Amino acid sequence: MARSLAAVLLLLVAAAGASHAASPAEMYWKIALPTSPMPGAIRDLISPASSVGSASKEDTVGNVFFLEKDLFPGSKMTLHFTRATAGAALLPRGRAESVPFASERLPEILSQLSIPAVSPTADAMWSTLAECEAARLAGETTKHKHYCATSLESMVEFVASSLGTRDVHAVSTEVISTLTPTPRQAYRVEAVRPVAVPGGDMVACHGMPYAYAVFGLHGLKGAGGGRVPRGRGRARRGGGGIQEARRGARERGHLPLPASGRHDLGAQLN
C-alpha cells in the first residue's frame, strides 16, 4: 500500500554549526536521508575536532521540560540546553562495531580505548552501558522502542525502520554560548510555529555520556511537535520542541521523550 510519508527528526541538541568539505559520513547521510540536510549538531561530531577518549561531564539531558500550555509568544521559562556529547567523536559503523558495547566487557573496552579504569570517563561509560542494557531487558511496547546507537549508520537505520520511511527532515536547537557547561538561564519565547505530525510517530534521540558519541533513541507514539524560531536568551537561538500527552518526570535518568509524526521523527541528541 503506497502512501506518502514525511518525517521530522527533532534533534534537540545544543551545538553550533560548522562548514567543511563533505566527509564519508555526510555522503552517507545524503544517500540515506536525501530529503534532509545533516544538522550542525551531527556534523560537529564527525569533525576533526571531535575525539575518542573522554566522556562529557555536562548533563546530556538538561532541563528542557515544559508544558504545551506554557509555550506561546511572550511566555517565559528557565531552561538548560546542553551540547550534544561535547567533544566526542561519532564513529563510523566499522570502527564502532570493532569495540564491544557491554558492561561485562568494560575492562576490555577501556583497554582498547586507552582509558584509565579508575576515572570519571570509565564511570560514565559504565552508567551508559547499564542504562542501555536495562532498556533492552525491559523490551519494547506498542508505544515505545528503545535503542542505543553507537554509529551514524545504526542511528539512521533505527530511525528509518521505526518510521517506515527515509523521507526525514532534521530540526535542531542551537546553543551559541561558548561557556562549558552551558548555563541554565531564563528565556522569553518570541514566536512558535507548530509542526504538522499527522502520522503520530516519532523517534526521539539524546546523547549519552561515553568515550565516543552514543545516542539513546526512543521510538514513540502520541506526541506533538513545534518549532520555536526565536527565544530570547544569551545561550540559545531557535530550536525545536516536543510535547507529550503523557507528562511525567524523568525516571532513573530516562528522558520521557514523546513521539508523533507527519511521521515525526523526534530525535533529542542532547
From Swiss-Prot:
Tissue and organ distribution: Expressed in leaves and shoot.
Keywords noted in UniProt: Signal
PROSITE patterns the record matches: BURP
UniProt signal peptide: 1-21
Pfam families hit by this protein: BURP (PF03181)
Compositional bias per record (Basic and acidic residues), positions renumbered to this chain: 244-254, 261-270
Keyword Zinc: no
Domain BURP: 65-270
Signal listed as a keyword: yes
Region spans: Disordered: 225-270
Name of the protein this chain belongs to: BURP domain-containing protein 1
Organism of this sequence: Oryza sativa subsp. japonica (Rice)
Record gene name: BURP1
